Amino acid sequence: MAIVGIDKLSLLDYEDKVSVVLFSQACNMRCPFCHNGAAVLGASKEDELDFDEILAFLKTRTGLVDAVVFSGGEPTMLEDLKVKIKAVRDLGFLIKLDTNGTNPELLEELLDEGLLDYVAMDIKNCPNLYAETCGLKFINVDNIKKSISLLINKAPDYEFRTTLVKEFHERMDYDAFKELIKGAKRLFLQKFVDREGCIKKGLHEVDVVEASKLRDYLSGFIPEVNLRGY
């Protein structure tokens, strides 16, 4: 696995920070609504970026950029993710990790070694709809729960985020979802947009009225629940 994409300037991926975003190759999920279909379904060898060249570019951004975001795909599938994060961190950048939470062991290592400043974890759905929402026949929800607990208890700062898609979330069990993220401090409910790059075409957003109902319900248990993109 390798880095296959770079956004050299982002004002959106790390709140209140100017960042560079690195996109890793491949993912262990197949969420039909994923916008990064090319990376998820596997970029070719020709798409791989030389990491030394990435570091050389980042050196020219010191003082201009606050942070580097490791995104994907699923970056915890990178065998040398820790090495790459350390190399970037040594240049003085903050580190944000975007993850689906399927690798709690590596996540805990990164947190325990103080290598992460912010983590954004996708919470796909309530447990009984999790695998379906991820485009899988089975998923180990226990690993998802472990990662949720790690962020709540160990992350310097974090957010959970759920992209609302009508085909998957109009059947969501609100109570089961609430229990899944019990103890969280921050959740973003994100608007789905059917755009070029999605793995499956023709899916639909959850309208703002229904999204607001879910936000209002969860606000009774989570200090910060916000709509994003609505």
Give the location of each predicted region.
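Conserved alpha-helical substructure of the radical SAM core
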Residues: 37-68
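A secondary-structure boundary/capping signal
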Residues: 23, 71-72
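Conserved AdoMet/S-adenosylmethionine-binding subsite of the radical SAM
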Residues: 55-67, 76-207
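Conserved beta-strand termini and adjacent loop/short-helix elements that scaffold enzyme active sites
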Residues: 6, 190-192, 227-230
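SEC14/CRAL-TRIO lipid-binding/transfer domains and related phosphoinositide-recognition modules
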Residues: 3, 7, 26, 39-40, ...
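Short, charged low-complexity linear segments at domain edges
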Residues: 1-17
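A C-terminal junction/extension of Radical SAM enzymes
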Residues: 212-230
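Canonical Radical SAM [4Fe-4S] cluster-binding loop centered on the CxxxCxxC motif
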Residues: 14-49
